[in-house]
Amino acid sequence: MGKVAVATTVVCSVAVCAAAALIVRRRMKSAGKWARVIEILKAFEEDCATPIAKLRQVADAMTVEMHAGLASEGGSKLKMLISYVDNLPSGDETGFFYALDLGGTNFRVMRVLLGGKHDRVVKREFKEESIPPHLMTGKSHELFDFIVDVLAKFVATEGEDFHLPPGRQRELGFTFSFPVKQLSLSSGTLINWTKGFSIDDTVDKDVVGELVKAMERVGLDMLVAALVNDTIGTLAGGRYTNPDVVVAVILGTGTNAAYVERAHAIPKWHGLLPKSGEMVINMEWGNFRSSHLPLTEYDHSLDVDSLNPGEQILEKIISGMYLGEILRRVLLKMAEEAAFFGDIVPPKLKIPFIIRTPNMSAMHSDTSPDLKVVGSKLKDILEVQTSSLKMRKVVISLCNIIASRGARLSAAGIYGILKKIGRDATKDGEAQKSVIAMDGGLFEHYTQFSESMKSSLKELLGDEVSESVEVILSNDGSGVGAALLAASHSQYLELEDDSETS
């Protein structure tokens, strides 16, 4: 009996030791995997680093590319497009004007009543309409007929407040946020469609001409006074309310910048210098690239997998379209190489663009003790049923790295523009007031991003100069801005000037 007891005891001891060894091995394996997670995190943080010296290099490279793009067509990755807008709104504009804003799957028609310096925008009315999917890939005349049908019905609802003097033609500003080769203030040919549109017979056609032909088909008498993109609309809207606005930046799904340049500083401009001495330049800065940009393996793979490899490099690391996708790619590597979400990689994590930037922003903004929002988003988006607090903290760290890099590079770009136009220092000992008008959901709604961008710009400018540089949110520039540009370039301005002087 004693031998049986001893044997049983020995067997139990062996079993306990084996179980303990298994637990130890699992813990060691788990610790090894977690060490790999931290290793991936630290490497990513180092690759994304944006010390102030690097930001200055990026800003200097931006300035060099701006000079090159202004010198000749195709001389730079920055297109530096001449907009033909040489007269931004001053606030003195009066009358009522229309705007048409086409930049995606929705479009808007708008009318604004302007009351001059004191009354400003007296009244505005608008209608928004979705474009049926079949029109996004159909024929050019079908799309423009649909748009003009909505516009004509909107015109028919003018109330008594919107009174057109006898003999005057309605005037419209057309915001068209697709790549265009501008031919004049009110004409430009489509280079290519983006954002899900694919209408072959519009490419290389004057988009204003297509719009006017559609108007003529329904008997709508309206002059297209200005063709602009959303960034120039934002600049116009900002200048209308603040005469010190010199730069506009869109930070939304995509990104772009426009600014006021001295006309004599544009070597590729061969026309007569405008009376104002100024010209608005549409930079198309999303296409900026430089060896100084801190690019990672995830950025390179995202670029290779994109529809336009090698293009829009800056946009792919700072805009709302891509920030969430960068996060997904880092999490996927952690899941595959370090079992971050357990032994099985969540199938949803393999779907490109499943993590949208608004979701990333919501997680980044989570201040609850247990990071409840992060856990909820991981469950809702990736179907990760459980996540530990330390996992959630890693996700927060990744959000912070990605957003901080994007925000600081945006600030470097703005600083580069200010350097180009001599607004990065005091002039004759005096500070020049410079205002940057911002628009776009990324800047407006992702607080950590916008705050980081503003503080980084201040860091680059220094305390003294930053006192005279202001960053403001200029909502709805793409709508109101186009109407304001129609007003500031109205065909009736010279008649009004003549009547005032006579």
Swiss-Prot record:
Protein's job: Fructose and glucose phosphorylating enzyme. May be involved in the phosphorylation of glucose during the export from mitochondrion to cytosol. Acts as a sugar sensor which may regulate sugar-dependent gene repression or activation. Mediates the effects of sugar on plant growth and development independently of its catalytic activity or the sugar metabolism. May regulate the execution of program cell death in plant cells.
Gene for this chain: HXK2
Reported tissue expression: Highly expressed in siliques, at intermediate levels in roots and flowers, and at lower levels in stems, rosette and cauline leaves.
Superkingdom as given in the UniProt entry: Eukaryota
Protein name per Swiss-Prot or TrEMBL: Hexokinase-2
Catalytic reactions of this protein: a D-hexose + ATP = a D-hexose 6-phosphate + ADP + H(+); D-fructose + ATP = D-fructose 6-phosphate + ADP + H(+); D-glucose + ATP = D-glucose 6-phosphate + ADP + H(+)
Species in which this protein is naturally found: Arabidopsis thaliana (Mouse-ear cress)
GO biological process: glycolytic process; hexokinase-dependent signaling; hexose metabolic process; intracellular glucose homeostasis; programmed cell death; sugar mediated signaling pathway
Transmembrane regions: 4-24
